[in-house]
Amino acid sequence: LMRKKIEAECSQLDPQPDAATREAIARHCYESARSCTAEARPMLEELAQDYPLVLVSNFYGNLEAVITDFGLAEYFKAVIESARVGVCKPDPAIFRLGVEALGLPPEEILVIGDSMDKDILPAASLGCRTLLIDGRPWPPTSESVVRE
């Protein structure tokens, strides 16, 4: 699906990149994503030892395949993906599905996100605790902020 997305985006460009350039873009995106997830692995391993984890994401319909390919699926009790559940962030309903998957009251759940508008505010509106992980400068309104 990533290649299809890149093909669709490239088709809007003038002039359109050749096949080798499109392939290089796809390879770069894949390797960048793999690198980022590799950096997250130690944190996920540690958290998953003590807490049930649910992944809530706006994605294209293949998130479970991607996290399986990257070796991360084992850390998540459930994956809530916008393309599969029919609701997208910032709608709090997608976070409600995550709460339901955990089977815990919202006030016992910590939502960790990198977007104030798409993660923190909708999760907080359900009563979840929140943690913003963000390297970009904007005024924090979450309970806690972790900066790079």
Language-model regions: role of each:
Residues 1-25:
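A metal-dependent, Asp-based hydrolase signature
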